Amino acid sequence: MRKVLKKAALCTFGFSMLFGCASEEDTIVMAPVPVVQNQFEPTTEWTSSIGDGVGHYFSRLTPVYAYQKIYVASRDGLVKALDPENGKTIWERDLEQDDTARLSGGLTLTYGKVFIGSENGELITLDAETGEELWREKVDGEVLAKPLADEGYVMVHTSRGALIAFDAETGVEQWQINSEVPNLTLRGDSAPVSISGGVFWGMSNGRLAAALISKGQLLWQQPVGTPKGATEIDRLVDVDASPLILGSRLYTVGYNGQLIALDLRTGQPVWKRNYSSAMNMSSDGKRLFLVTEKDHVVAVDARSGTELWSNEELEYRQLTSPMIIDSYIVLADSEGYLHWLDRDTGLFMSQQEIDSDGIAVSPILVEDSFLVVTREGDIKKMRIK
């Protein structure tokens, strides 16, 4: 049975402006759960929890495996380091002060520190070994995207269109690059990435930018999408996906825009294809895997931009970004299912219902296992048999 959802309702609950907000008469139809003959069944190694999770709020708050620990956080401010062997808590820290912490951007683990952003406009830094709070700085706008730490800096991309760099040790602001933000944008921002002293990020105005980390000097900008249409909704062109770097090329995709391959040094386009998405992509080095605005899962040849396969059976199931685990593409959805697709064909290989409350972010790899966190904060470490 297909589930019919109001676009306006989706916007109200914030799952996504990914569908755009329209009149009450506009509806989308969520595809039913596909019938899959499972080729394998993952086993659960242990379970744990992290507060109340992120609830029904928009969130890309993602766990991280680093320093032989699993780091997780909840929207209301609880941060934990877990033992990957048994899920037991090594340390925990409550970041709530006068108001709910509203953690939203992260987690980032670098320099022996945990960097987390919040909807309250804060960048918070903890000691990764002890959980001790080291420093906390205010920024103009929400921090919805994962911070980036490189070259001794930690950088955040805010909802006001600013990329701000702080000294990773002291929290002192070093530089800021600002961009114009349209009146209406999607919920979410592009997490910056870096290589060879350069930082790259997408903007709400439909452009991709590059800057020199050491100076905060803008190097180039490249349009990914051009506003079209009569209404502000039609003219949404946010580039919310985090750029993806493969060799000498950089890949990005925009909402109502294009999937584009760029020369990393010059920013000049190598090829463009008509795909619309606000989700991060993944790659196995030869292929790009993306989820479109309609939740179609697509594989594209990274060299030429040729579409290799497309799976449309999960349409409007509010998928997470695609994750590569072994020879599979793994996606979770808003009804709490994990879907496993064959990397070469896009065909279903397995499916599990993890939690009916839904899953907001992709699973992560933990050595030869993987970790799933539900919207309500339940944590499962699992392994393919």
From Swiss-Prot:
Lipidation, kind N-palmitoyl cysteine: residue numbers? C21
Q: Could you give one GO CC term from the UniProt record?
A: cell outer membrane
Q: Which domain of life is it from?
A: Bacteria
Lipid-bearing positions (S-diacylglycerol cysteine):
C21
- Give one Pfam family, short name only: PQQ_2
Swiss-Prot/TrEMBL keywords:
Cell outer membrane, Lipoprotein, Membrane, Palmitate, Signal
Name the SUPFAM superfamilies for this protein.
Quinoprotein alcohol dehydrogenase-like (SSF50998)
Write the signal peptide boundaries. 1-20
Tell me, what is an example of a GO biological process annotation in this record?
A: protein insertion into membrane
Cross-referenced Gene3D superfamilies: YVTN repeat-like/Quinoprotein amine dehydrogenase
Q: Where in the cell is it found?
A: Cell outer membrane
InterPro entries from the xrefs?
BamB, PQQ_b-propeller_rpt, PQQ_rpt_dom, Quinoprotein_ADH-like_sf, WD40/YVTN_repeat-like_dom_sf
Please report the record's description of how this protein sits within the membrane: Lipid-anchor
- Family of the protein in this entry: Belongs to the BamB family.
* PANTHER family, A to Z: CELL SURFACE PROTEIN, OUTER MEMBRANE PROTEIN ASSEMBLY FACTOR BAMB
Q: What does this protein do?
A: Part of the outer membrane protein assembly complex, which is involved in assembly and insertion of beta-barrel proteins into the outer membrane.
Quaternary assembly: Part of the Bam complex.
Q: What is this protein called?
A: Outer membrane protein assembly factor BamB
Q: Which organism is it from?
A: Aliivibrio fischeri (strain ATCC 700601 / ES114)
Q: What phylogenetic lineage does the species belong to?
A: Bacteria, Pseudomonadati, Pseudomonadota, Gammaproteobacteria, Vibrionales
Please name the gene that encodes this protein. Answer: bamB
